[in-house]
Each structure stands twice: as C-alpha cells, then as structure tokens.
Amino acid sequence: MPLTAESAAQQIQDRLKDIQQNIHNVDEERRRAENSIASLVRSLHATNQKVKPLLKASLTEAAQEEATIRAALAKIHEIRSIRNERRIQARNAGNKEAIRRGALMKMVQLSAQTLPLFVGKLGERAPALCGAIPAEGNYVAKVGDNVAALAKGIDEEENWILAEVVQFLHRQNKYDVIDIDEEQKDRHVLSKRKVIPLPLMRANPETDGHALFPKDTVVMALYPQTTCFYKAIVHRLPQTATEDYEVLFEDSSYTNGYAEPLPVAQRYVIAYRPTKKGAGSGSGNLSSA
C-alpha cells in the first residue's frame, strides 16, 4: 500500500515524539547513574559486601541508559526509512523534483555526514558495510541504496559513478541503477560485479580502527564536488568519528603522479576495483577532471 504524504508526516511526527521522550529518559537515567557512581567511588575502601550492591546498581543503570539511547537511534533509523520510501515513491510516480547541481552536491555531502555511526556492544565486531568492511558475496543492495556503478557514458568509456538502485533483477543477477547526477538522468542495467554497495555505517576510529582502510591503501574515492569515483591512495585516516579520510588522487599533471591531499568521507571511500582498461576516469587519472 502506497505511503501517502500525510501518513508519512504522521509517522515521522510520532517517532519524533518518541525520540523526545527517549532524550528526557536518558537525562534522568544519566543523573541516577552519576549518583550511583559517586556513591560507588566513596565506598571503594568499604567491604565487598557494601561495594557489590552499588556496583551492580551502577551496571544496571548504565545498561538501561544504553538501551534508551539505542531505542532513540532505532527511531531515527525508522524516520530515515520512511523518508526514503516516500522519495522512491515520488520518483516512481514521475514526481521527482529537479535538483540543481549545488543542491545535489550538498545532498551528497549531507548523506555522508548523517550516515549512522556503528556503536557496538562489548566485544561486538563491526559488521559488513561498516566503514571499509565490504558487503558479503551474496549481498544485494536495497532499492534506494547508493552504490558505485561502473557505467558507460556518452563517449562509451566506463566510469565509476555514484548511482541509486532502482531494482535488482534476480533472474539476470543484474542491477537496474540510475545516475545520481540530475544532469545525466541515465539508467543502466549492470551485472552485479559492476556495482559496489556503499557503506551503510561509519566506523569509529577510536573503537573500530580495524574497519578503516590502512594508510597507503589503494582505494576508489568520490572526487569532491563530482559524482565520480577515482583511484586514490589513503594519505591520512580519520582520527574521530566525524573526520574524513585524506586521500591522494592520481593526477598526471603532478611530478609524483598524485594531487594534494583532499578530504573524502567514509561513505565514499571503497575498495579499489580495476577496470579492463586499467586507467583513466573511474580508475584514476584526474589531469582533465
């Protein structure tokens, strides 16, 4: 059943109210936890019999605070899903509004900034499609997901472009994708090996450094203010959850073959996959980009 604008707005409003209540609950739970921790610190030199109940209470309150925060994050994810569903319906109905180039670039940047941060539980490893961790072999990107797609342009050259999944054709094992660039509006039917799902979560360098590309790794990265991926080398890793990579894009106009470092968000830095020609746009040279 189609999701109407009114229904979507109401569902989002309901979830925003839930989030507001979650935030209020987190504040209360944090105050209780701080009081319990203060009592625990004051009792550190007391007998185990007195310390154990305080320690147990502190752990329980911390777990409750974590659960409330995760509940709020789940509501935020639901809101993102509702908005995405409405956007897909509008596109399929032919009601998609034209987006100017500047607005598109801002949307691309905002999509990276608001990508959910993976916050694992104790001992939990970052999953597939978190940071640099690739999708599993049998994974199929969902309708509306952004991907890197190796598609032919007007000049018949293949380039890695930022695209959106329209559908997955199971019988053909191919993706139907649309160029994210409004000026192109091209649709492509591509084999699965020519489509790379983008990360669905950011990795926190402070807790999940293994989910980031190491320094000097050859990658593909979205060149700033464009919708194309090019070959690059990781120059500097993010140090915090909000920082970007710094990468060196190939550029034959420089004596060492690489341009100056540029920031690229985790969402748009993916494993390098060479094309048949092994050079040029989508696999590297930016001298004419």
Swiss-Prot record:
PROSITE patterns: SGF29_C
Chain residue ranges for the region called Histone H3K4me3 binding: 249-251
Subcellular location: Nucleus
Domain SGF29 C-terminal: 137-278
Entry coiled-coil feature ranges: 9-36
Site (Histone H3K4me3 binding): Y223, Y230
InterPro entries: SGF29, SGF29_tudor-like_dom, Tudor_SGF29_rpt1, Tudor_SGF29_rpt2
Gene Ontology BP terms: chromatin remodeling
GO cellular component, one term: ATAC complex
Segments of this protein annotated with the region Histone H3K4me3 N-terminus binding: 179-181, 225-228
Keyword line: Coiled coil, Nucleus, Transcription, Transcription regulation
GO molecular function list: methylated histone binding
Domain notes: The SGF29 tudor-like domain mediates binding to methylated 'Lys-4' of histone H3 (H3K4me).
Subunit record text: Component of the Spt-Ada-Gcn5 acetyltransferase (SAGA) complex consisting of wda/Taf5L, Saf6, Taf9, Taf10b, Taf12, Ada1, Spt3, Spt7, Spt20, Sf3b3, Sf3b5, Nipped-A/Tra1, a histone acetyltransferase (HAT) module made up of Gcn5, Ada2b (Isoform B), Ada3 and Sgf29, and a deubiquitinase (DUB) module made up of not/nonstop, Sgf11, Atxn7 and e(y)2. Component of the Chiffon histone acetyltransferase (CHAT) complex consisting of Ada3, Sgf29, Gcn5, chif/chiffon and Ada2b (Isoform A).
Function per UniProt: Component of both the SAGA and CHAT histone acetyltransferase complexes, which both predominantly acetylate histone H3.
The name this protein goes by in its record: SAGA-associated factor 29kDa
Protein species of origin: Drosophila melanogaster (Fruit fly)
Upper classification of the organism: Eukaryota, Metazoa, Ecdysozoa, Arthropoda, Hexapoda
Gene: Sgf29
